[in-house]
Amino acid sequence: MAFMEKPPAGKVLLDDTVPLTAAVEASQSLQSHTEYIIRVQRGISAENSWQIVRRYSDFDLLNNSLQITGLSLPLPPKKLIGNMDREFIAERQRGLQNYLNVIMANHVLSNCELLKKFLDPNNYSANYTEIALQQVSMFFRSEPKWEVVEPLKDIGWRIRKKYFLMKIKNQPKERLVLSWADLGPDKYLSDKDFQCLIKLLPSCVHPYIYRVTFATASESSALLIRAFNEKGTLKDLIYKAKPKDPFLKKYCNPKKTQGLELQQIKTYGRQILEALKFLHDKGFPYGHLHAANVMLDGNTCRLLDLENSLLGLPSFYRSYFTQFRKINTLESVDVHCFGHLLYEMTYGRPPDSVPVDSFPPASSLAVVAVLESTLSCEACKNGMPTVSRLLQMPLFSDVLLTTSEKPQFKIPTKLKEALRIAKECIEKRLTEEQKQIHQHRRLTRAQSHHGSEEERKRRKILARKKSKRSAVENSEEQPVKHSNSNNSAGSGASSPLTSPSSPTPPSTAGLSSALPPPPPPPPPPPPPAGPSPTSATEMPAPFLPQPVNGVNRGALLSSIQNFQKGTLRKAQTCDHSAPKIG
């Protein structure tokens, strides 16, 4: 079986869903304007970063381009006089940073081509509309029956996927949509298997999968034609949008959104799950479910864009499920994405963040139960249910589907094996990315905790306690060392001093074993009548501090016990205190 693990040599396949972060690091004032130096980073690796220089006019141009969204973005206002003042520049720099933060926090805006070109001009300088037109023109040379009516500009969210309204020359009233897409970072099929599978898509027949009229592929891209649907997608229904409008205008800040009725949620949800189950049973990887990839045909939902996984394109929700290590298969990705779709169908908008801590009131508790099983903290932490499990839940189990169309999609055994290996490679890249994000998050939390005010206070308290403890230990060691030195000098011992914690064993082994720990010494005898030239070993020395060494104490006690009064010499006293008379 032909199989390719790496993209073609010389071709860089970027994952456009990897978030970009931007930090305005500094500013530099030139003669007539100020430039802002911005550090841009792709993903979590600081090594994958670069600097760009932008003027305020560049930000203003970007902001004007984003007005199509209808969002009120916090771009700092213009200032003609005093705009070179140092304090003003610092304030504007903070404002521009906040502006970038707001844009990058928006899931739709952060993936749009306008922002990518602003932050990463080296990788997004190509005109993909022109590239797509060239590819389509080459296709028309061999297929002259098709004709382009007009380009459908930016109706999708993908940067490297373009759409054109088409017609057949001998059927001028029938409208079709041609989609052209470049390869993505998860393209692991060989060129031969890739082209065969793309051409196999028109043979896929299922009541809940949108039919492909024509499909072909080259070594670097794919081109598919489908019937144009005036009503648009399920997302168009929810957002009250026109299918031909640009993606940013339709979905970024809709004025009117409306959740669906309970019966619609049940029916559409069941239809989508049946389509997913069919693909899973066939071993065909999907991973691209979202409301704009579900065509609404009357009262029937049909999945779109089966070719995306063959092209290796990243999922719309990839930046969400890469945060959760338990969502590590394409089947679990489909279930998680279904949770996003169900949330939009229920509440008329996407969730503010994922995982969802608490769900707003819904038309049925059965809806909330499915949402909790796919979007809650517990579900994201422990893993997704299967599609079969969702079909058995009360929300969908009692839905009756009536269709006369028999599903069929015959995939040759050789291509099934190619799909299986490609699916494993896609899941492997996902798992590795999740692992890197998890490790980065742990490191970031540790650094944040280490640098927090509470942690700094705790470390100061511990340092003070340790310092006090060391001071107390040092003060206790000083008299012990002093007594050891005095004792060694008084007894004439030649052995070196030792610390109290590790006493040196005595030189005579029998003494330490024969003598138990001695009792306190008895009170000294009364002082003699006069001075005596006795040696120090024959006289008690009560003025010496009690030594802690067991050998010295034993010697002192033995000297006291063996003392004999008779060994003292008699002394004659001459009393000169009487008065002299003479």
From Swiss-Prot:
The keyword RNA-binding does not apply. Keywords: Actin-binding, Cell membrane, Cytoplasm, Membrane. It comes from the Eukaryota. GO terms for cellular component: centriolar satellite; cytoplasm; cytosol; plasma membrane; protein-containing complex. It is found in: Cytoplasm; Cell membrane. Residues 483-514 have a biased composition (Low complexity). Residues 433-550 are annotated as: Disordered. It is a peripheral membrane protein. GO terms for biological process: inflammatory response; modulation of chemical synaptic transmission; negative regulation of ATP-dependent activity; negative regulation of monoatomic ion transport. Its main location: cytoplasm. Residues 515-531 have a biased composition (Pro residues). The keyword Glycoprotein does not apply. It holds the Pfam family WH2. Isoform 1 is present in all tissues examined. Isoform 2 is found in all tissues except skeletal muscle and very low levels in spleen. Both isoforms are widely expressed throughout the nervous system however levels of isoform 2 are higher in purified hippocampal and cortical neurons whereas glial cells express more isoform 1 than isoform 2. Residues 88-481 form the Protein kinase domain. Residues 437-448, 457-469 have a biased composition (Basic residues). Binds to and modulates brain Na,K-ATPase subunits ATP1B1 and ATP1B3 and may thereby participate in the regulation of electrical excitability and synaptic transmission. May not display kinase activity. The protein kinase domain is predicted to be catalytically inactive. Belongs to the protein kinase superfamily. This is PX domain-containing protein kinase-like protein.
